[in-house]
Every structure is written in structure tokens, then in C-alpha cells.
């Protein structure tokens, strides 16, 4: 699909390159009338990042979707001032698409990487975030501390909510 940058009007373009068709076949199998965002160049960029790391952890975080549950109409969308708008590439909005983190995961160099796909909820809970409210007794003995702890609990709960930010996919590659 080609998009007019001024109007957002779409029209069919030429067939994808063979490498992009191969990526689609493996990572986003399509039936007629469906659409996808080709992630081959993103996967190549991620592989390049991993190839430069000699030791450490590379983390990618995104809404994500697995190969067995790709959205039938793609995920391309636009945002302006935090509001969802049509993805017209005229510079008036940010344009984004969800990442096929499973395809990125497959780019890891064999033998020198530990790869994990998880959710933000699970990753942050493993780091000790719980979103648990402080004991109510603290409100009586140390009200300011209670309010700080309550605010922190609310922030943590937002980060790990599985229907919100906690549903983000996390791809972690440990190298070295």
C-alpha cells in the first residue's frame, strides 16, 4: 500500500521485494484482503544492535503481538497530543505500529544470547513491583509516609495492569 502524504489516501503499490515477502510468509501470514506491517528492516536493525553488544542486556518494549495472533488489519495508527488520529504522514502526528517482538527475538546470535519474551507486568513484578497498598495503620502512625506509599502503589499498579501498560511485551536479550 502506498499512502499520499498530504491526504492519507491509500492505493495499491508494487508487490513487496522477495525478502519482505519471505518475512511476511514466516512472521505475518496473510489471507487476501488483510494487511500487515513488514518488520524485516526493523529485525535487521535489532540484529545489528545485538551484534555490537559484547556483554549486557538489550531490551525492547512494545505493545507487540505474537505470530499466531496478528491483527488482521495491521496496527498502523497516528497520535497527536496523546489522541488517536488517522495515520496521515503529513508531519502533523506521530505514526506508529506495534512490533512483532517474536520476529525480533529470532534475530539473536546463536550460542551467545539468552532470549526472553515476557510482559511488562511479569518483568516488573520480578523486580519487586507489586502495586500493593500500604497497611492502613500507617495512615495513623505516619500519614505522610502512608500518602507517599499509596501514591507509589498507584503508580506501580498502573505499570503492571495487564489490561494497560502491564500488557506491553518485553523482549530481553542477555549477551555474554
Segments from the language model and where they lie:
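Long, Lys/Arg- and hydrophobic-enriched amphipathic alpha-helices
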Residues: 18-176
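Conserved beta-strand signature within the Rossmann-like core of class I S-adenosyl-L-methionine
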Residues: 1-14, 55-63
Amino acid at each position: 500500500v502506498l499512502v499520499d502524504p498530504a491526504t492519507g489516501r491509500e492505493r495499491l503499490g508494487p508487490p513487496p521485494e522477495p525478502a519482505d515477502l519471505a518475512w511476511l510468509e514466516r512472521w505475518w501470514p496473510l489471507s487476501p484482503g488483510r494487511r500487515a506491517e513488514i518488520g524485516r528492516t526493523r529485525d535487521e536493525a535489532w540484529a545489528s544492535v545485538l551484534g555490537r553488544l559484547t556483554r549486557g542486556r538489550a531490551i525492547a518494549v512494545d505493545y507487540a503481538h505474537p505470530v499466531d495472533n496478528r491483527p488482521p488489519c495491521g496496527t498502523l495508527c497516528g497520535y497527536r497530543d496523546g489522541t488517536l488520529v488517522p495515520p496521515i504522514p503529513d508531519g502533523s502526528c506521530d505514526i506508529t505500529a506495534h512490533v512483532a517482538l517474536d520476529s525480533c527475538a529470532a534475530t539473536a546470535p546463536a550460542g551467545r544470547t539468552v532470549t526472553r519474551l515476557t510482559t511488562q507486568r511479569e518483568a516488573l513484578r520480578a523486580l519487586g513491583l507489586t502495586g500493593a497498598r500500604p497497611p492502613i495503620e500507617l495512615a495513623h502512625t505516619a500519614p505522610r509516609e502512608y500518602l507517599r506509599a499509596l501514591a507509589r502503589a498507584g503508580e506501580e499498579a498502573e505499570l503492571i495492569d495487564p489490561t494497560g501498560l502491564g500488557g506491553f511485551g518485553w523482549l530481553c536479550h542477555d549477551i555474554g
